[in-house]
């Protein structure tokens, strides 16, 4: 089914001496015609992987994309589907030395590139998994002041198994010894160092940056995301890597600042953290 629609992978979206192999986007064109009255949207996926895993990139969306391409009722409203790559953190020796807001800046560049090519303005939906869900909602929380041209905010965002409060995530898994060092490395690699310990309030500049980067710490979505039509959070209670409370508490934050009915939740998906994109039926 997917072969019926033109697909191009690894399309560069940054053209400068600072571009890397991560500055690419996979594109599948479904129906880019603007000649009829059917409202159509671009669907843009942001992968997870803890801002650092080189084995989890845009191509992990291919299964979900192929499932979507089987749904005629959905396709009637889709202009195209894209999956974004962005610079990673965690291992400078391998070129993975991005630090917040580098990941977010790359996502904005990719969306800006797609908009310049296809002209969808705010007619796009962002789907993010795990760290990709963080990035998706960072687009909505960010004020319209940036050193980069900021694309228009999406009409809808779907966050799957998302990380929305960085400090709370670390505290919630601190008692799990096998995850503790891994999570400290992941979060400090992406957002900067801090003197963290279970149950303590983080101190210093970096802790402030962690909070500034956490979608659950923002309280002004009503003004920063004025065109919001849907904010959907989905999560599995069986998620072994990101606690369900990340989504339940963030839902409360969103409901307090967005109009009634905009926030929708589904916290009954089955499976582990990565089953969301490895077994795409639920998310589709």
Curated annotation (Swiss-Prot):
It comes from Aspergillus versicolor. The active site is at residue 130. Pathway: Secondary metabolite metabolism. Gene3D superfamilies: alpha/beta hydrolase. Transmembrane segments: none annotated. It is an enzyme of class 3 (hydrolase). It comes from the Eukaryota. Its EC number is 3.5.1.9. Pfam families: BD-FAE. The keyword tRNA processing does not apply. This is Kynurenine formamidase avaC. Belongs to the kynurenine formamidase family. Keywords: Hydrolase. The gene is avaC. Kynurenine formamidase; part of the cluster that mediates the biosynthesis of a highly modified cyclo-arginine-tryptophan dipeptide (cRW). Within the pathway, avaC catalyzes the deformylation of the cyclo-Arg-formylkynurenine iketopiperazine (DKP), produced by the FAD-dependent monooxygenase avaB. The first step of the pathway is perfornmed by the arginine-containing cyclodipeptide synthase (RCPDS) avaA that acts as the scaffold-generating enzyme and is responsible for formation of the cyclo-Arg-Trp (cRW) diketopiperazine. The lineage of its organism: Eukaryota, Fungi, Dikarya, Ascomycota, Pezizomycotina.
């Amino acid at each position: 089914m997917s072969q019926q629609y033109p697909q191009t992978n690894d399309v560069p979206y940054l053209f400068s001496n600072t571009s890397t192999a991560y500055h690419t986007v996979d594109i599948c064109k479904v129906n880019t015609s603007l000649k009829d009255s059917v409202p159509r949207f671009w669907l843009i996926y942001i992968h997870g992987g803890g801002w650092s895993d080189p084995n989890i990139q845009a191509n992990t969306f291919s299964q979900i994309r192929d499932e979507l391409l089987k749904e005629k009722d959905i396709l009637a409203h889709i202009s195209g589907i894209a999956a974004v790559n962005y610079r990673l953190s965690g291992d400078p020796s391998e070129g993975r030395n991005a630090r917040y807001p580098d990941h977010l800046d790359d996502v904005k560049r990719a969306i800006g590139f797609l908009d310049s090519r296809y002209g969808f303005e705010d007619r796009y939906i962002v789907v993010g998994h795990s760290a990709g869900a963080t990035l998706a909602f960072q687009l909505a929380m960010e004020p319209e002041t940036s050193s980069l041209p900021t694309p228009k905010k999406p009409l809808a965002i779907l966050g799957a198994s998302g990380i929305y409060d960085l400090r709370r995530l670390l505290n919630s898994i601190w008692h799990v010894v096998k995850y503790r060092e891994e999570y400290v490395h992941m979060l400090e690699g992406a957002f900067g160092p801090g003197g963290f310990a279970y149950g303590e309030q983080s101190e210093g500049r970096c802790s402030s940056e962690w909070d500034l980067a956490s979608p659950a710490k923002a309280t002004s979505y009503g003004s920063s995301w004025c065109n919001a039509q849907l904010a959907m959070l989905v999560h599995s209670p069986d998620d072994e890597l990101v606690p369900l409370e990340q989504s339940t508490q963030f839902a409360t934050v969103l409901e307090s600042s967005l109009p009634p009915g905009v926030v929708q939740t589904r916290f009954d998906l089955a499976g582990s953290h990565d089953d969301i994109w490895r077994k795409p039926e639920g998310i589709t």
